[in-house]
Design a protein with these regions (language model features):
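Glycine-rich phosphate/diphosphate-binding loop of Rossmann-like nucleotide-binding domains
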Residues: 3-23
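C-terminal binding/interaction regions
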Residues: 3-5, 9-10, 88-149
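A short beta-strand-loop structural module common to alpha/beta enzyme folds
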Residues: 27-38
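Short, ordered loop/turn segments at secondary-structure junctions
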Residues: 33-34, 66, 107-109
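Structural motif
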Residues: 37-46
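Helix-adjacent hinge/juxtasegments
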Residues: 47-84
Length: 149
């Protein structure tokens, strides 16, 4: 199950992603927003990320105008490793090497076609582990307030 969230500026992109997920049989829960009326991304962001952290969902897909604000908010939720992506390579390698569990995109930055490609590669790429696991462990240690130096 995937958690989807957006603000008003990412609403239309989220709706296009929902259509694609429906067509491909990927289950999701939409935590809002539910219209193009003004809505602050931190609310839907936190709802979606909480579902990932609790284990109810395996990943979050989050949309706002640029993807930046919603990714900043997502990374404040303990246990979330969010990445703002606008290209295929980053969307793939954020999963492959960084074990990201939230993909953030900007409706004002990329079109629906590219966004769907990024969603597909993000959801279908497994974490490689190995030498990258230590780096993910370091990220999580920083989140806990540990010093790496």
């Amino acid at each position: 199950m995937i958690a989807l969230g957006s603000d008003h500026a990412g609403f239309s992109l989220k709706e296009e992603i929902k259509k694609h997920l429906d067509e491909t049989g990927v289950e999701y829960v939409d935590v809002g927003c539910y219209s193009p009326e003004r809505f602050d991304y931190a609310i839907s962001d936190q709802k979606a990320c909480d579902k990932v952290v609790s284990g109810e969902c395996t990943a979050a897909i989050l949309c706002c105008g640029t993807g930046v604000g919603i990714s900043m908010a997502a990374n404040k939720v303990k246990g979330i490793r969010a990445c703002c992506c606008s290209d295929y390579f980053s969307a793939k390698y954020t999963r492959l090497h960084n074990d990201a569990n939230a993909l953030c995109m900007g409706e004002r930055v990329i079109g629906a076609g590219l966004a769907i490609e990024l969603v597909d590669v993000f959801l279908n790429t497994e974490f490689e582990g190995g030498r990258h696991q230590n780096r993910v462990d370091q990220i999580m240690a920083i989140e806990k307030g540990e010093k790496l130096y």
